[in-house]
Amino acid sequence: MKKQSKTHKVDYKYYNSGSKTSRNRNVQQLETNNKIPQSDVVGPVVKISKEVTNETDIISPNNPIINQNQEIFDTYQKSYIEAKKFLNDHNIKISTITLDCKLGTLIDVDLFAKNVILKEDQIVSVKFGNRNDPATNRTIVVLKTKKKPSTKNFYNQVTILMKPTNNPERNYINIKVFKNGSLQMTGCKDMEDFNNVTVKLIEILKNGRRSKKDNKHIKFITDPNKIGIYDVKIRMINSDFKLDYKVDRKKLAKILKKYHGQNTKDKEIGYVECKYQPTGGHSCVNIKYNNDGNKTSIFVFQTGSIIITGAKNLNHIISAYFFIHKVLSRYYKKIKILPLQQNLVQLEIAKYFQKVNQKTYPVEIQE
């Protein structure tokens, strides 16, 4: 009996892209194929929730293109859920996703910073303008701060902190809200985090608030009817995993430069662009991997920790994972740092002191 895919509800009422005609065409085409995308794919304007399967979720670098061209949508090698399963099965963790989008309306960042209500399940921190102004720099949580706090004053954007309510264990997500209606977001672990906090933020901006003095409505945005999620773009995904052995970075860098330089004849791995600076910079071998025009950085540390940064989607991470494993597997015996065996170490120490005790020293005779 075939196992049914797990379904979840997605609210598309704030998702917008393209003209009305193109949106309707996309709705019909996607519904016909039963491929209503969630995650980061910008969906059509729909007032009701849709039942969608996890198997159709895909992380893509440019959502409007996906929404306007079903063929591009179908060219992605793996679905979002399949890619996430691969990462989980291979203990690859997403550390952060950096992305941005547009809300389709201007925002009065000054009024927003001064009047937005801070709540634990919504916005918990606001930073705007002069960092010494308590009216526009407020928080209800205690967080670790930088040793040297920023002294720069920003008047074109508000920085807020929000935690995804769908996953309370997540750290706070840092969101920069700009006057022109753009958002820049860091700290998401997956696109569900993005969807959760963005929809909540839109509701806050759309509702505004009532003034305590005269009960007048304070508007945070210029056009509540046009606010939505437009042009979502993933800028970078950082991930990491751990090897079960330690790596001799010096040997690895030497091997790559010797056998995989620009004039290499190796066809399987080919040219590998790498840097290793033991003093200064990263204490790792920095390998650049080009995947379909997207240059991903792979950091190999002595501890066996591997960081993959600069990916635009999950398939970039998976491709970089296979590449670095191909390199490390070929030279495994040469680059692996053998662990010290305690019994052999103790035996060598005992032999050393035994030799020291057996030595005879000349004795001075006093006349």
From Swiss-Prot:
GO molecular function: DNA binding
Keywords: DNA-binding
4Fe-4S among keywords: no
Skewed-composition ranges (Polar residues): 16-26
Family annotation (SUPFAM superfamilies): TATA-box binding protein-like
Region (Disordered): 1-26
Record-stated family: Belongs to the TBP family.
Protein name, as recorded: TATA-box-binding protein-like
Taxonomic source organism: Acanthamoeba polyphaga mimivirus
